[in-house]
């Protein structure tokens, strides 16, 4: 029987999660039926979702025999919105912990992009026994860069888009989001803009969260040595959102880690170099 590609609608699920005395309705996609589970955590861009972030990576993982969970973090996608005044990544980690507990999944491999990478580190530091392998892609430690002024130009444009969600600002952000912009079609811009504007509460609450606590992503650098999981770090040589030296900091801090850098690549390695990225990850996950 030939493989049937996964669809967003067929894999869409919801669970209720208790957080700080409130009940949040959390959306995720549940794909495949493998014995091992890979959780994919998206970045913090306006309009981001688990499915949109990893659309080019889901089928290869499922076809290789993995169960794949794509979480919409609170404040993104179809999940409930929230104003967060603490560590955003620890919040995301707690939400994920509740979801995998309710799904009765004992151990997961974590693959996180940008904010999702930082959240994956938070989850691993809090519940190391629940993590198999770790893939961190363009997700920094929360610390400062040695070579690039902070915030980076990418983060400045991202924050501008949150405050003024227009097609012009979206194109300004995406223009430096990827290295080769020729794949950025009008249809992609339209879909992303519609995604953003359909949940203005997410946009407004992200800005309120930054005002309540500008340091949403604390520096995990001093704790990286606690991570014992085998870790694959992936970066774009031309990333203008999270500087490449953040990847070197992860490599230095996590003993069981290795770093792969894609040339001609921005902040979205899993999309810009999908075939090579998928093979890299599958080979890493298959290793003993």
From Swiss-Prot:
The record marks 192 as: Catalytic role in ketonization of the dienol substrate (substrate destabilization). Pathway: Aromatic compound metabolism; 3-phenylpropanoate degradation. Residues 38-273 form the AB hydrolase-1 domain. One of its GO terms (cellular component) is cytoplasm. GO terms for biological process: 3-phenylpropionate catabolic process. It catalyses: (2Z,4E)-2-hydroxy-6-oxonona-2,4-dienedioate + H2O = (2Z)-2-hydroxypenta-2,4-dienoate + succinate + H(+); (2Z,4E,7E)-2-hydroxy-6-oxonona-2,4,7-trienedioate + H2O = (2Z)-2-hydroxypenta-2,4-dienoate + fumarate + H(+). One of its GO terms (molecular function) is protein homodimerization activity. This is 2-hydroxy-6-oxononadienedioate/2-hydroxy-6-oxononatrienedioate hydrolase. It is an enzyme of class 3 (hydrolase). The record marks 114 as: Transition state stabilizer. Keywords: Aromatic hydrocarbons catabolism, Hydrolase. Homodimer. It comes from the Bacteria. Its EC number is 3.7.1.14. Catalyzes the cleavage of the C5-C6 bond of 2-hydroxy-6-oxononadienedioate and 2-hydroxy-6-oxononatrienedioate, a dienol ring fission product of the bacterial meta-cleavage pathway for degradation of phenylpropionic acid. The active site is at residue 267. Belongs to the AB hydrolase superfamily. MhpC family. InterPro entries: AB_hydrolase_1, AB_hydrolase_fold, Epox_hydrolase-like, MhpC_alpha/beta_hydrolase.
């Amino acid at each position: 029987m030939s493989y049937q590609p996964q669809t967003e609608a067929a894999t869409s699920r919801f669970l209720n999660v208790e957080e700080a005395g409130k009940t949040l309705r959390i959306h995720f996609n549940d794909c495949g039926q493998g014995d091992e589970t890979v959780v994919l955590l998206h970045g913090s861009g306006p309009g981001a979702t688990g499915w949109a972030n990893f659309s080019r990576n889901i089928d290869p993982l499922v076809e290789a025999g993995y169960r794949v969970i794509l979480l919409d973090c609170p404040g993104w996608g179809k999940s409930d919105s929230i104003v967060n005044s603490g560590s955003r990544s620890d919040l995301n980690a707690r939400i994920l912990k509740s979801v995998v507990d309710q799904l009765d999944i004992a151990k997961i491999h974590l693959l996180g992009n940008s904010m999702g990478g930082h959240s994956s580190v938070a989850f691993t530091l809090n519940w190391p026994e629940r993590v198999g392998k770790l893939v961190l892609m363009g997700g920094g430690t929360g610390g400062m860069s040695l070579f690039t002024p902070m915030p980076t130009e990418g983060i400045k444009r991202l924050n501008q888009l949150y405050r003024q969600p227009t097609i012009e600002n979206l194109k300004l952000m995406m223009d430096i989001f990827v290295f080769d912009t020729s794949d950025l079609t009008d249809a992609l811009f339209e879909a992303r803009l519609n995604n953003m504007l359909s949940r203005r509460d997410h946009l407004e609450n992200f800005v309120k969260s930054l005002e309540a606590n500008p340091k949403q992503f604390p520096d995990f650098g001093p704790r990286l040595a606690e991570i014992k999981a085998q870790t694959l770090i992936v970066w774009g040589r031309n990333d203008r959102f999270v500087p490449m030296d953040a990847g070197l900091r992860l490599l230095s801090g996590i003993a069981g880690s290795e770093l792969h850098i894609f040339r001609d690549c921005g902040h979205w390695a899993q999309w810009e170099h999908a075939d090579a990225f998928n093979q890299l990850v599958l080979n890493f996950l298959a290793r003993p």
